[in-house]
Regions:
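ATP-binding/phosphotransfer module of carbohydrate and carboxylate kinases, centering on a glycine-rich
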Residues: 1-64, 70-79, 100, 121-130, ...
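Phosphate-binding/catalytic loop of phosphoryl-transfer enzymes
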Residues: 88-186, 322-326
């Protein structure tokens, strides 16, 4: 990686793509400049073209910042890109990505699934453990000295247990059960109406909406807010906390580090902004792995993406990073 050139980092999720530019400073450090968030990637579409488009968006913003308002020097160039993305699979070739962005003078790219960059963001590359990244969706990554394991991240229809969209889906189900008389009355009925309108019309909106996952996830904050006042909301949040803890424990076990004395577990993402979720997650983790240290993330996903170029070959995560250079 060219240490004299700036590095563009992308955190590409389904609800938004965040970007920053790390500019080298004379003292050997870096200055980070965050760029405006752009629309998220769609897992139903080819990923590489979407990442190329978002890179061009970031490059145009970078060019405008070389004047006002950031006054970045005109001699500053971007030499490499580090990307953590939802939906990244083995058929997403770093070479294809590099071909699509080389017109901007970029000569090196690193690509990884966002479970990898999420892990690096929370625990770095020198500590073993598990990281649960829970926002609209959820994916968990466990890392040991020899193995790494991904858990969940399979989308709102068949996975994402404990994620915001998962909680929103359960909240809608509870509201519809109450509406029909199949379940108890709940304050989540009002939440559903505030987000989607008339209950008897929700299904028409939901099934024709290509942003349904995002809109389901938008209910989660209200669900967690009501956990102390509504029995149904309490049950949903308790289940979510336990599912997230089960994913973390499974990742530790599959990475063969659950018996290690010095392991860490970290939860990151908007779901963990809820005190109810974070406290119950910790409780469930300690019931499964009493010796695990629960720690706050040391960085954010963009800082995790920035580390992709520094992962040593003997780290299990190294094999999950696609790299191309000209």
């Amino acid at each position: 990686m060219n240490k004299k050139a700036a590095v563009l980092c992308l955190d590409a999720g389904q609800t938004g793509v965040r970007a920053c530019i790390d500019i080298p400073k004379p003292d050997g450090g870096e200055e980070r400049i965050d760029l405006p968030e752009k629309p998220g990637v769609k897992n139903s579409h080819p990923l590489i073209p979407q990442l190329i488009e978002r890179t061009h968006d970031a490059f145009r913003m970078f060019s405008s910042y070389q004047n006002e308002p950031m006054n970045i020097g005109k001699d500053t160039t971007i030499g490499s890109i580090c990307v953590g993305s939802s939906g990244l699979s083995k058929d997403c070739r770093a070479e294809d990505f590099l071909d699509g962005v080389s017109d901007m003078g970029i000569s090196e790219v690193f690509l990884a699934h966002d479970s990898v960059t999420g892990y690096l963001a929370a625990l770095g590359h020198e500590r073993y453990g598990a990281v649960v990244s829970a926002g609209t969706g959820v994916v968990t990554r466990g890392v040991g000295p020899h193995l790494t394991k991904r858990v969940d991240g399979w989308g709102w229809m068949i996975g994402n247990a404990g994620a915001a969209s998962w909680m929103g889906k359960l909240a809608l189900e509870a509201a519809m059960r109450a509406y029909d008389g199949r379940g108890p009355q709940t304050r989540l009925t009002k939440v559903a109406e505030e987000h989607f309108g008339r209950l008897d019309k929700i299904y028409l909106k939901l099934y024709s909406d290509d942003q349904s996952t995002k809109h389901l996830g938008s209910m989660a904050e209200d669900v967690t807010r009501l956990a102390g006042e509504d029995a149904v909301a309490f049950e949903i949040c308790s289940k979510a906390s336990k599912e997230l803890a089960i994913s973390a424990y499974t990742a530790l076990r599959k990475a063969d580090v659950d018996k290690y004395a010095d392991i860490a577990v970290s939860g990151r993402g908007s779901v963990f902004n809820s005190r109810f979720i974070s406290d119950h997650f910790t409780m469930y983790i300690h019931s499964m792995v009493p010796h695990a240290a629960i720690i706050d993330p040391i960085g954010d996903p963009l800082s995790g993406a920035r580390q992709l170029g520094y992962i040593e070959p003997d780290n299990p995560l190294h094999s999950l990073i696609a790299h191309a250079i000209k």
